[in-house]
């Protein structure tokens, strides 16, 4: 797994985990700002790394373990902010529960939490999602343009998604949904001295209802932040300055 680092001479550390169907450069706009102030670590997740097109996505658990191993190898014992979006939020949450490194603050942006449903139901959901994305992979840009509103996604953004869909494997698509829906979390999560935030856009409120309920039950100290006029995972590309300011506000607050 390739790990990209920026601003390594800075003191405060931020880890950014990208969502599915994009690459690590999803964070391009905020990286140009963050690297001037922070040491930023961005993994290129297996299956979504254009430099390693023969790799497949493994699992939420395995990636979290590999990231922990990398941090220990580089003698990083504390992370000031761990951010993950959607699939990346699943990995961030799993990493947080491992307690292998001190995470002072965590943001789960539209994070997918493990379904609390019977096994057969979760597999049916995974099959539905797999088929939907696979059809997009086959149909390419023309199908994406018909399926997504041009008011929310520009032509360039749709071309980017089509590019990613073109090189990722069907195995990666399947494992992404199967793992994000069913990764294993500890039954009891110990108290955390930092802050936990769950972000979601008002346009995805219904889709995130189960995830929000999960966080309320298993992480009762979570702060829920709803952003108006936003969909799923749209802040990094559409509102990078606002996103960076949210990061600063979270890290700089006195505990």
What are these regions (language model features)?
Residues 83-92:
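Gly/Ala-rich beta-loop-alpha elbow adjacent to hydrolase catalytic centers
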Residues 97, 103-133:
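Flexible "cap/lid" loop of the alpha/beta hydrolase fold
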Residues 117-119, 137-190:
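Conserved alpha/beta-hydrolase catalytic His-Asp/Glu region
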Residues 192, 198-200:
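Short beta-strand/loop motif that positions the catalytic acidic residue
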């Amino acid at each position: 797994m390739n790990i990209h680092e920026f601003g390594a001479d800075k003191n405060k550390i931020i880890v950014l985990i990208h969502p599915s169907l994009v690459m690590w450069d999803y964070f391009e706009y905020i990286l140009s700002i963050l690297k001037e102030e922070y040491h930023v670590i961005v993994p290129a997740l297996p299956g979504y790394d254009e430099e390693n097109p023969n790799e497949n996505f493994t699992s939420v658990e395995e990636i979290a373990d590999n990231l922990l191993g990398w941090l220990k190898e580089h003698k990083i014992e504390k992370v000031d902010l761990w951010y993950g979006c959607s699939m990346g939020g699943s990995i961030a949450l799993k990493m947080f529960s491992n307690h292998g490194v001190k995470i002072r603050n965590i943001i789960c942006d539209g994070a997918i939490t493990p379904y609390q449903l019977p096994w057969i139901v979760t597999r049916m959901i995974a099959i539905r999602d797999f088929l939907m994305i696979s059809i997009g992979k086959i149909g390419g840009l023309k199908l994406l343009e018909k399926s997504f509103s041009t008011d929310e996604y520009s032509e360039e953004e749709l071309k980017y998604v089509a590019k990613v869909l073109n090189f990722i494997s069907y195995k990666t698509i399947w494992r992404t949904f199967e793992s994000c829906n069913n990764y294993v979390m500890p039954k009891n999560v110990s108290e955390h001295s930092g802050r936990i935030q769950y972000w979601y856009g008002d346009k995805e409120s219904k889709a995130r209802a189960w995830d929000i309920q999960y966080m309320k039950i298993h992480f009762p100290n979570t702060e829920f932040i709803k952003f108006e006029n936003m969909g799923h995972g749209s802040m990094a590309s559409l509102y990078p300055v606002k996103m960076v300011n949210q990061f600063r506000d979270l890290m700089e607050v006195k505990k």
